[in-house]
């Protein structure tokens, strides 16, 4: 597809419009620019800089999600069998992201030092039942090449060597266990977004408009959308053959404005977050890992605590949390009316049903909102017994909007991401949250392949994407062999030595 589809060649028409300049839209923009360099597309961003909302370094929780240590991705079924399908899927998607970064870095197009650092990923538990679960998880996961390098230990001294702050002031007789994968990462997705858009902006067919907000959109004929946009109080209209809605929590509002039939099944449930942050060098230098615990029985998945080493603005920090809360806003910089404006005739009953069914979530959010500083630090002490309240301060994290989807019985609350596509491929929207950013490449490849942009030359464009992400590698049906080759190549390019 080329911009020749615009017969009048006027400045108000674009082959594609991407709403939002976070990690999702910037990833899609990068893919379009690399495999369809001749099409004319526009990126709209409400704020004055890219990656400032959900993608912001302090605003996203899973910075390097690969399912190495997140125990909620490997649940037990009703018979006590460990299910690792989701962990495998997330890990493979993350490796796809790593492969794209490796290709772009090798070609001199991005600087990985600005956004990627290798850091071990650790799962930590205490108590015999949790230790049994972690051992079962270790045994099951190491049967797969994705997790073959995982280590397991119940040795207090060995776990101390992995994460000394976890064991300091902890009774050595306490039953504890941990797994570790050295090849974990910390990813600054805000910095990565800026790398992507710096590269994309070199394409003369791409325009990025900041301080520009989508007001409304409607389908005006079979091949075009009309979008009303506002910039510093001035409203104008543009047209496009394809629209991607990647505006974080606000996507649900925009999707509803589109009036596509596929939008009628959805609602959103906003959740806010807060971090405990430590900048003290004597502590940050002693902790070099991301450590995930296990959620209490009956607690929602978002309650899983983690103590992370993070690098933000070239500074090493410790972040613990996130502690959840409730607000009716869908973004940090949006309106308290977001939730209310998203309630429609076709989703109100599913939203009410979710509220009635999820008392544990409601109670959890209330309890989290009522916590003071000392009670949050007491929670931290479950993972870091030596924590001192004076060493930590509180900072607001980003907004998440969990998906509410209509079902035959009412509604269901979904944790994760979901793509909504119009039947003709002219509009796509990304809803949901975790593991989002880490799997952005796989998600955006799927978005692109189902879009009208791929309509006329799908096979050739799919080959271009494979060549971009996996140069000099043949996509093999034997995934075990393929993943080993991918990891070997990526490790070599990144200079990671297991």
UniProtKB/Swiss-Prot annotation:
The record's keywords, sorted A to Z, are: FAD, Flavoprotein, Oxidoreductase, Tricarboxylic acid cycle
Q: What's the EC number here? A: 1.1.5.4
What Gene Ontology molecular-function terms does this entry list? Answer: 2-hydroxyglutarate dehydrogenase activity; L-malate dehydrogenase (quinone) activity
Q: Which GO terms describe its biological process?
A: tricarboxylic acid cycle
Query: Per its UniProt record, what SUPFAM superfamilies does this chain match?
Result: FAD/NAD(P)-binding domain
Question: Per the entry, which co-factors are needed?
Answer: FAD
Q: Which reactions are catalysed by this chain?
A: (S)-malate + a quinone = a quinol + oxaloacetate
The pathway that the record names for this protein is:
Carbohydrate metabolism; tricarboxylic acid cycle; oxaloacetate from (S)-malate (quinone route): step 1/1
Keyword Transport on this protein? no
Q: Does the keyword Iron-sulfur apply?
A: no
Q: Which top-level group of life is the source organism from?
A: Bacteria
Q: What class of enzyme is it?
A: oxidoreductase
Annotated PANTHER family:
L-2-HYDROXYGLUTARATE DEHYDROGENASE, MITOCHONDRIAL
**Record's family?**
Belongs to the MQO family.
NCBIfam families named among the record's database cross-references: PRK05257.2-1, PRK05257.2-3, PRK05257.3-2
What's the protein name?
Probable malate:quinone oxidoreductase
Q: Which organism is it from?
A: Prochlorococcus marinus (strain AS9601)
């Amino acid at each position: 597809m080329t911009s020749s589809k615009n017969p009048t060649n006027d400045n108000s028409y674009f082959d594609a419009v991407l709403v939002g300049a976070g990690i999702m839209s910037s990833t899609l923009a990068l893919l379009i620019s690399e495999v369809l360099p001749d099409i004319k597309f526009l990126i709209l961003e409400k704020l004055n800089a890219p990656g400032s909302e959900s993608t912001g370094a302090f605003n996203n929780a899973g910075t390097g999600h690969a399912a190495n240590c997140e125990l909620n991705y490997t649940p037990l079924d009703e018979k006590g069998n460990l299910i690792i399908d989701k962990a495998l899927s997330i890990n493979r998607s993350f490796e796809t992201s790593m492969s794209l970064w490796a290709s772009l870095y090798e070609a001199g197009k991005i600087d990985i030092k600005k956004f990627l650092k290798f850091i071990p990923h650790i799962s930590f538990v205490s108590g015999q039942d949790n230790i049994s679960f972690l051992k079962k998880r270790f045994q099951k996961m190491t049967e797969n090449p994705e997790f073959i390098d995982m280590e397991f230990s119940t040795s207090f001294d060995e776990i101390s060597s992995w994460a000394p702050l976890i064991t300091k002031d902890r009774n050595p007789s306490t039953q504890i266990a941990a797994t570790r994968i050295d090849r974990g990462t910390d990813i600054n997705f805000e910095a990565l977004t800026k790398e992507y858009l710096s590269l994309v902006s070199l394409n003369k067919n791409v325009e990025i408009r900041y301080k520009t907000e989508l007001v409304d959109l409607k389908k005006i004929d079979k091949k075009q959308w009309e979008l009303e946009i506002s910039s510093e109080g001035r409203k104008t209209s543009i047209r496009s053959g394809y629209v991607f809605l990647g505006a974080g929590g606000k996507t649900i509002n925009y999707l509803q404005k589109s009036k596509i039939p596929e939008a009628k099944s959805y609602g959103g449930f906003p959740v806010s977050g807060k971090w405990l942050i430590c900048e003290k060098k004597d502590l940050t230098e002693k902790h070099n890992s991301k450590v995930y615990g296990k959620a209490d029985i009956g607690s929602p998945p978002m309650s899983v605590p983690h103590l992370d080493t993070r690098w933000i603005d070239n500074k090493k920090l410790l972040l613990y949390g996130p502690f959840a809360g409730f607000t009716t806003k869908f973004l940090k910089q949006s309106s308290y009316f977001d939730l209310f404006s998203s309630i429609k005739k076709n989703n109100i009953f599913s939203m009410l049903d979710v509220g009635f069914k999820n008392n544990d979530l409601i109670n959890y959010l209330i309890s989290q909102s009522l916590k003071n500083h000392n009670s949050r630090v007491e929670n931290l002490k479950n993972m870091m017994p030596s924590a001192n309240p004076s060493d930590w301060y509180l900072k607001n994290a980003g907004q998440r909007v969990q998906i509410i989807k209509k079902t035959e019985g009412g509604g269901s609350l979904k944790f994760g991401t979901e793509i909504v596509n119009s039947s003709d491929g002219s509009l796509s929207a990304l809803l949901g949250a975790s593991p989002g950013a880490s799997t952005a490449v796989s998600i955006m490849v799927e978005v692109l392949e189902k879009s009208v942009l791929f309509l006329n030359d799908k096979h050739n464009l799919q080959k271009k994407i494979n060549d971009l992400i996996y140069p000099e590698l043949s996509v093999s049906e034997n995934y075990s062999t393929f993943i080993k080759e991918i990891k070997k190549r990526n490790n070599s390019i990144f200079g990671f030595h297991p």
